[in-house]
């Protein structure tokens, strides 16, 4: 069974591992760098940019896969899924138009408005900097609301800036908005949104164009340093619970979040056609219930590393069910176990990360700790590993409870040597308790 995988990060390493649990799978991967974890699992690798559509076509024509799985968002944005489907290859990953739920923040917000989907917030879109943009921010200030500045296109999760975090106040938000236009960050179009106050969580679904099957809820930790301090990153780690909920998330709130995602899928279908792939909703649990911050048209990273290792159902079967519109024909189950994922990242990340420095990894010690190792932005050359400037590698602990899973992950992450750092508090009971207390305060 030939499977084409596009992507070379930790998320794709998790996808590759999950696929290879089926002994019939022969994996063929197109990726930019030599990720040693994915490389070891692949029959053949094409080293090309994941947005190089001609290279994707050439590799697919050569290997003739029976199914394709697209990991990152960038190939979706250039129509890789459209191309593969046109070639007659069943593909997991939405086509270019449905993928706009991630690639165009304006499309997403307008969809919520048009179809009256719950969980939306006050926003406005702008094509240039001027009095209208300034007036909208001034209006938010008069309402006592801080704002979030979001370049409308893809920025690899690095373009969004929030008042109270990267920005001092709404006046500084205006300065950053002007910079986005001056430098054409994310395509030179902007969404200004009200800043939500609450606790974040993520919810994933397998989507086959009509049906959505939900995965366990996960909490990511975007801040660089312990105690949720420092700049926003792509995610320093995450955890999930044995009951597939989260300690601060009631069943009622989880149900509301699921209904928002269900209506989103139906609305995408009506607007631009069927959505087939993984859908990841980033939510904020506020005093008014769950609000959607943004959607991603793929697995979250790090969340994929929490979810895929505890998937009991054959992942290849799930992928075919997604591509063929048959999710209602299979039973998808996850183990009732806790997971804790911790990332090791280059010193200086995400502002000014060191690059091309050697990273020593004691794989045996990580295995002895009963953790799973996932390689991310790593390049292997002459048997040595080098960090490339983004998140380097992650470890995942799995156990009957959060406390034990965290201990496994923590023991494992101490086995990296190089110019790197990590957060030691992810999955700890102290940090989780703070989340619970914060939600209690919101309810008052």
Curated annotation (Swiss-Prot):
GO annotation terms (biological process): 'de novo' IMP biosynthetic process; purine nucleobase biosynthetic process
Disulfide bridges in this chain: none
UniProt binding sites for Mg(2+) 2: 294, 296
Any one Pfam family match given in the protein's UniProt record, by short name: GARS_A
Residues binding Mn(2+) 2: 294, 296
Cofactor note: Binds 2 magnesium or manganese ions per subunit.
EC number(s) on file: 6.3.4.13
NCBIfam families hit by this protein: purD (TIGR00877)
Recorded family membership: Belongs to the GARS family.
Protein name: Phosphoribosylamine--glycine ligase
């Amino acid at each position: 069974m030939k499977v084409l995988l596009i992507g070379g990060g930790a998320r794709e390493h998790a996808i590759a591992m999950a696929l290879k649990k089926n002994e019939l799978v022969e994996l063929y991967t197109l990726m930019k760098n030599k990720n040693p974890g994915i490389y070891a699992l692949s029959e053949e690798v094409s080293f090309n940019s994941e947005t190089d559509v001609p290279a994707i076509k050439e590799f697919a024509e050569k290997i003739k896969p029976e199914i394709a799985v697209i990991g990152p968002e960038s190939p979706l944005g250039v129509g890789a899924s459209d191309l593969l489907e046109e070639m007659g290859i069943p593909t997991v990953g939405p086509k270019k138009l449905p993928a706009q739920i991630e690639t165009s923040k304006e499309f997403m917000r307008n969809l919520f408005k048009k179809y009256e989907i719950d969980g939306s917030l006050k926003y406005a879109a702008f094509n240039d900097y001027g009095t209208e943009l300034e007036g909208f921010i001034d209006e938010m200030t008069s309402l006592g609301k801080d704002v979030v500045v979001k370049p409308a296109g893809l920025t690899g999760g690095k373009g969004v800036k929030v008042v109270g975090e990267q920005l001092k106040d709404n006046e500084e938000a205006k300065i950053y908005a002007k910079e986005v236009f001056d430098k054409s960050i994310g395509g030179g179009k902007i969404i200004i949104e009200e800043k939500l106050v609450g606790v974040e969580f993520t919810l994933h679904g397998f989507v086959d164009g009509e049906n959505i099957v939900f995965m366990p809820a996960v909490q990511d930790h975007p801040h660089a340093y312990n105690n949720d301090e420092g700049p926003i990153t792509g995610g320093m780690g995450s955890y999930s619970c044995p009951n597939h909920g989260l300690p601060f998330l009631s069943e009622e709130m989880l149900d509301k979040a699921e209904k928002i995602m269900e209506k989103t899928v139906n609305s995408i279908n009506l607007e631009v056609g069927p959505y087939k792939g993984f859908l990841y909703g980033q939510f904020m649990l506020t005093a008014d219930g769950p609000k959607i911050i943004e959607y991603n048209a793929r697995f979250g990273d790090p969340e994929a590393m929490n979810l895929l290792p505890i998937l009991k159902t054959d992942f290849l079967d799930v992928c075919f069910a997604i591509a063929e519109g048959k999710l209602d024909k299979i039973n998808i189950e996850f183990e009732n176990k806790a997971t804790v994922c911790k990332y090791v990242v280059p010193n200086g990340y995400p502002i000014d990360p060191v690059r091309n420095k050697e990273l020593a990894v004691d794989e045996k010690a990580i295995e002895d700790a009963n953790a799973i190792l996932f390689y991310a932005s790593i390049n292997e050359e002459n048997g040595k590993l080098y960090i490339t400037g983004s998140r380097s590698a992650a470890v995942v602990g799995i156990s009957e409870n959060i406390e034990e899973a965290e201990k496994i992950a923590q023991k494992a992450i101490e086995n990296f040597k190089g110019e790197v750092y990590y957060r030691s508090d992810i999955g700890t009971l102290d940090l989780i308790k703070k989340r619970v207390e914060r939600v209690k305060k919101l309810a008052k």
